[in-house]
């Protein structure tokens, strides 16, 4: 082995008597678990001789380093801290020699600084008139005792010269005061207990031989009369419920405690059984029957007869003793506040109604203005004006503003119908003239009876056909998803007709009805045709412009 740090190392040597020359015999003698147990159970033999000198791994190394030894380091540390402690004690001794404990001097009565002030305070305590020897002696003793107590305890907590938290004497004084107070309180608490024990002693001596005697004694002497609270009388507290209030359902119930004079007395409150209730009801019904027969009118045959004299008991009122109900005229402040609130609400409602009426009047005026403008536009239309295309939305005129306009609209509609022409051809010229006057509103009451001519023209015994009338659909209109295909839905929308209820109420029966919506079928071919027409129109327009000599922007392909 190579040497490290000039120290030779060697492999450990085998113990004495161990021979490993024959490896075959070593392999044959294998140890088992039993051999291992025996080895564990046999005690270790004491060494007969010293360990061999060749094994040097337990020896101290040649060069000993004191810093690496933990015991040496511990000793050094102890000596260092001992020196520090000694220096600290010496410093405290020096400070104690220079420091003067004035509080200790004051407690011992050796304080030189307060000698002059004590003389002044003691001379002020003496009286002007010389007292007797005994009084002087007792006063001096008391004064000396007070001085000593003030020196030791420091006087009262508020006026003491001791510092709270620094002087131990003040803490002792406060503790003594707290202990004395607690003792006094305990004595006060124990006094009534002792007195009650003294009172109970003679009673405890009583012995009862029977249960009956014990019960009699308890009922006579031990039963305590219950103190009645005058506030809790039967029927004194009642719930106040305002039936006129809008928020009566959610209002918090308020309680009212009535005065004793208003409360019903116990004598007045009679407990009625079921029989008494039935009897009272029967008497009430009989009294009603008597009053009803007396107030009936006499028949013709009984008019001449004199009224039979009734016994005085029949007219007696069973509720004679009960006085009439006198309502209180004064209202509570809460009722007054509610009345004011309701008045304010009524005024607001009136103002709102007025505003609504004004708005309606304005709307009516606007409608009349629009109707006049439409009439003027119709008059201005020329004969050769283009008809409206199907794609353009049709303006549905609103109802007429007055009865005259309603009659005019009826005349215009019926003048173009075939049935009306047939009836006109059958009539005489005089009737035509009268009818013209009738529709012209020259001399008739048609304004008051707007449906008169309508009833004359279309009156029949058959029932009116209400199949086309728009009676309203509670489930809502049919939509796209109520049909299987788009074609069925478009066919339904094209054929859908509905007449307003007003037409049936006023007697106007339209032949074809009104289509609710202009639903047009859109297919690819129609769309392509429309686009081709637009493109061809643009091309024609450009050709005309080129022919006229106008420069046209040419697209780049």
From Swiss-Prot:
Residue list for modification Phosphoserine: 287, 417, 460, 536
Location of region: Disordered: 1-84, 181-205, 294-402
InterPro entries: Red-like, RED_C, RED_N
GO annotation, biological process: mitotic cell cycle; mitotic spindle assembly checkpoint signaling; mRNA splicing, via spliceosome; protein localization to kinetochore
UniProt biased composition (Basic residues): 294-303
Cell location: Nucleus; Nucleus, Nucleoplasm; Chromosome; Cytoplasm, Cytoskeleton, Spindle pole
Pfam families: RED_C (PF07807), RED_N (PF07808)
Gene Ontology CC terms, in alphabetical order: cytoplasm; mitotic spindle pole; nuclear chromosome; nuclear speck; nucleoplasm; nucleus; U2-type precatalytic spliceosome
N6-acetyllysine PTM sites in chain numbering: 98, 137
Disulfide-bond pairs as recorded: none
PTM-bearing positions, type Phosphothreonine: 485
Crosslink (Glycyl lysine isopeptide (Lys-Gly) (interchain with G-Cter in SUMO2)) position: 151, 310, 331, 386, 388, 404, 408, 496, 501, 509, 541, 543-544, 553
UniProt biased composition (Basic and acidic residues): 16-25, 304-313, 332-398
GO molecular function, one term: identical protein binding
Domain of life: Eukaryota
Chain segments carrying region 17 X 2 AA tandem repeats of R-[ED]: 342-375
Subunit structure comment from the entry: Component of the spliceosome B complex. Interacts with SMU1. Interacts with MAD1L1. May interact with DHX15.
Role, per record: Involved in pre-mRNA splicing as a component of the spliceosome. Auxiliary spliceosomal protein that regulates selection of alternative splice sites in a small set of target pre-mRNA species. Required for normal mitotic cell cycle progression. Recruits MAD1L1 and MAD2L1 to kinetochores, and is required to trigger the spindle assembly checkpoint. Required for normal accumulation of SMU1.
Recorded family membership: Belongs to the RED family.
Protein's recorded name: Protein Red
This protein's encoding gene: IK
